[in-house]
From Swiss-Prot:
GO terms for biological process: isopentenyl diphosphate biosynthetic process, methylerythritol 4-phosphate pathway involved in terpenoid biosynthetic process. NADPH binds at T10, G11, S12, I13, G36, N38, N124, E126, G205. Belongs to the DXR family. InterPro entries: DXP_reductoisomerase, DXP_reductoisomerase_C, DXP_reductoisomerase_N, DXPR_C, DXPR_C_sf, NAD(P)-bd_dom_sf. Its cofactor is Mg(2+); Mn(2+). Mn(2+) binds at D150, E152, E221. It holds the Pfam family DXP_reductoisom. Transmembrane segments: none annotated. 1-deoxy-D-xylulose 5-phosphate binds at K125, S151, E152, S176, H199, S212, N217, K218, E221. It comes from Trichormus variabilis (strain ATCC 29413 / PCC 7937). It is an enzyme of class 1 (oxidoreductase). This is 1-deoxy-D-xylulose 5-phosphate reductoisomerase. Pathway: Isoprenoid biosynthesis; isopentenyl diphosphate biosynthesis via DXP pathway; isopentenyl diphosphate from 1-deoxy-D-xylulose 5-phosphate: step 1/6.
Length: 398
């Protein structure tokens, strides 16, 4: 039985991970839980899964959590604040830590888990996007496994099983196209928050659903794929695949192409990350290609999706620039969800912030450099949102 700590337990990734654990009680057990601010849901999870330790990032809500489970016996260790989440991530009894926290907030807990010798089921792409220059050397130093738990990188990882070293030629990341794949570019000026949250295929959290609508999610995945699989950016391509049945593909040196297929269900990559290298039987609905029907592909529209180009440019710049891109995107999407800026302001603001960082880009950033760049970018967004009157030039991927 594998012992698991789940960081980000009340979010979309967290609840689906717990669904898997509840289906396979003879395979997995929860020893640690950490969440952001949802006291009620975390208390319910503690009651059901009986972890040894739990934390809530919103420290002011710790007394409410303590009160909500005061009748439990035995009592888990309860902690509050970011430091509490980090303690949960490094807790001794866990073999694998699932990182399901959204955004750069997952970086420090992931590093703590790696330094404690835990294998990582990585569902938090920002850990590598912002912290790749720091995280990958730590993974090697501590001899832990870094297993992708999002659908696209899990698909690539699965396709690579049995491929000899040097056999990989190209990665093709598939994208649904998000909520606006069938909209004309001219209509994007009318986008509301409700429009952006209508993903055609996947059920996800609010932030990642907006990222899917801008295709920044796919741009961030390009950077993550670069760190995970070691390919140059010119060898990582994005293709629009509206059905979300093929989760990604790899091209080998002899031009053979391998793909991983399945219904759009995050539980499958999560289960594989938890069970690897084993394959566990499930009673989930198998893929029926006749039922799925046509599988279609098209090139992404760079005019409609400028965030894609910004991500490629940041990835190629390297250093601390991906951390700035990621932080700016997180902050701008939060402003959009609060209806403080328009949808089309998202790429404009991100580009302004990245442009301002060019002269300060740190080529070989330390963890402190990355955290400083992250904080700088978030503050810079507030300035950039005041300077959106003129349409900027979009950075080219070429």
């Amino acid at each position: 039985m594998k012992s698991i700590t789940l960081v980000g337990s009340t979010g979309s990734i967290g609840t689906q991970t717990l669904d898997i654990v509840s289906q396979y009680p003879d395979q997995f057990r929860i020893v640690g839980l950490a969440a952001g601010s949802n006291v009620e849901m975390l208390a319910e999870q503690i009651r059901q899964f009986r972890p040894q330790i739990a934390a809530i990032s919103a420290a002011e809500k710790l007394p409410a959590l303590q009160a909500a489970i005061k009748d439990l016996d035995p009592q888990p260790i309860l902690l509050g604040g970011e430091a509490g989440v980090i303690e949960v991530a490094r807790y001794g009894d866990a073999e694998t830590v699932v990182t399901g926290i959204v955004g750069c907030a997952g970086l420090l807990p992931t590093i703590a888990a790696i330094e404690a010798g835990k294998d990582i089921a990585l569902a938090n792409k920002e850990t590598l996007i912002a912290g790749g220059p720091v995280v990958l050397p730590l993974v090697e130093k501590h001899g832990v496994k870094l297993l992708p738990a999002d659908s696209e990188h899990s698909a690539i990882f699965q396709c690579l099983q049995g491929v000899p070293k040097g056999g990989l030629r190209k990665i093709l990341l598939t994208a649904s196209g998000g909520a606006f794949r069938d909209w004309d570019v001219e209509r994007l000026a009318e986008v509301t928050v409700a429009d952006a949250l209508k993903h055609p295929n996947w059920s996800m959290g609010r932030k990642i659903t907006v990222d899917s609508a801008t295709l920044m999610n796919k741009g961030l995945e390009v950077i993550e794929a670069h760190f995970l699989f070691g390919l140059d950016y010119q060898d990582i391509e994005i293709v629009i695949h509206p059905q979300s049945i093929i989760h990604s593909l790899i091209e080998l040196q002899d031009t053979s192409v391998l793909a991983q297929l399945g219904w759009p269900d995050m539980r499958l990559p999560l289960l594989y990350a938890l069970s690897w290298p084993e394959r566990i039987y499930t009673d989930w609905e198998p893929l029926n290609l006749v039922k799925a029907g046509n599988l279609t592909f098209r090139e992404p529209d760079h005019q409609k999706y400028p965030c894609m180009q910004l991500a490629y440019a940041a990835g190629r710049a390297g250093g601390s620039m991906p951390a700035v891109l990621n932080a700016a995107n997180e902050q701008v999407v939060a402003l959009f969800l609060d209806e403080k800026i328009k949808f089309l302001d998202i790429p404009r603001c991100i580009e302004l912030v990245c442009d301002r960082h060019q002269n300060d880009n740190c080529a070989n950033p330390s963890l402190d450099d990355i955290l400083a760049a992250d904080q700088w970018a978030r503050q810079e967004v507030l300035t950039a949102t005041k300077n959106l009157a003129s349409q900027p030039q979009i950075i080219s991927v070429n």
